[in-house]
């Protein structure tokens, strides 16, 4: 069962912190490994979003019954405005906050693609970033923590 939009909303965790996504959240880290190195497709959050102006991955609330990979791909479509057609599923990482989790789904694409000319309202800009440039960007704090845990920063 998947009720579209059913996961939208904040929840309060036992420690008093708030998280977006009543059933957790997920995002997709798109990776391309080529002769010129490893690249990641990132999105700069629009000023209409929490911590606007920072870089992260497309992602958001999971709907009731939605698997992390499905939610991550759906959010990519909503925020970037295009679908990922050719990819290989890589690792999936769960960041458990005690009753609420954020899932980072890593997928590999055979080639870098151009971002669409029109992006979703939550995204100010999207582009490919070389792995050695990740630490030079102003990253969304939780995304920075994830990259550190994954050994990418």
What are these regions (language model features)?
Residues 60-153:
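Unchanged
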Residues 2-56:
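N-terminal strand-loop-strand
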């Amino acid at each position: 069962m998947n009720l579209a939009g059913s996961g939208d909303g904040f929840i309060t965790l036992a420690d008093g912190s708030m998280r977006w996504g009543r059933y957790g959240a997920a995002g997709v880290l798109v990776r391309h490994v080529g002769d010129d190195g490893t690249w990641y497709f990132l999105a700069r959050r629009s000023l209409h979003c929490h911590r606007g102006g920072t870089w992260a991955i497309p992602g958001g609330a999971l709907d009731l019954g939605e698997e992390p990979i499905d939610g991550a791909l759906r959010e990519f479509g909503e925020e970037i405005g295009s679908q990922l057609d050719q990819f290989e599923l890589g690792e999936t990482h769960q960041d458990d906050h005690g009753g609420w989790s954020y899932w980072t789904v890593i997928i590999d694409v055979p080639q870098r693609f151009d971002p669409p000319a029109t992006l979703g309202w939550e995204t100010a800009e999207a582009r490919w970033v070389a792995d050695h440039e990740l630490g030079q960007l102003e990253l969304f704090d939780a995304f920075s923590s994830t990259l550190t845990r994954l050994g990418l920063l």
